[in-house]
């Protein structure tokens, strides 16, 4: 869990903004959303495999674009 030390004479708004940024960097919100509902192990494997296929297709597409440019 991220923590923020409030400096002396620092407005609360700025401290809250720093805390939000720290939470975002740590991935707290995405983790909470991911664990909001139970996901069966088979569904999790299916989702991860689909994401891997998507990344692979995107990588192939980027590589094909690099090789076809002739300028």
UniProtKB/Swiss-Prot annotation:
Pfam families assigned to the protein according to its UniProt record, in alphabetical order: Ribosomal_S21 (PF01165)
Bias kind Basic residues: ranges: 48-60
Signal peptide annotation: none
Feature: compositional bias, Basic and acidic residues: 61-71
Alphabetic keyword roster: Ribonucleoprotein, Ribosomal protein
A Gene Ontology molecular function term of the record: structural constituent of ribosome
Domain of life, per lineage: Bacteria
PROSITE patterns from the UniProt entry: RIBOSOMAL_S21
One GO CC term on file: ribonucleoprotein complex
Similarity field: Belongs to the bacterial ribosomal protein bS21 family.
Protein name: Small ribosomal subunit protein bS21
Organism listed in the record: Psychrobacter sp. (strain PRwf-1)
């Amino acid at each position: 869990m991220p923590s923020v030390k409030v400096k002396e004479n620092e407005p609360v708004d700025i401290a809250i903004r720093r805390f939000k940024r720290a939470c975002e960097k740590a991935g707290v919100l995405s983790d909470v959303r991911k664990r909001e509902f139970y996901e069966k192990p088979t569904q999790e494997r299916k989702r991860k495999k689909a994401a891997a296929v998507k990344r692979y297709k995107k990588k192939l597409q980027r590589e094909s674009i690099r090789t076809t440019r002739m300028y």
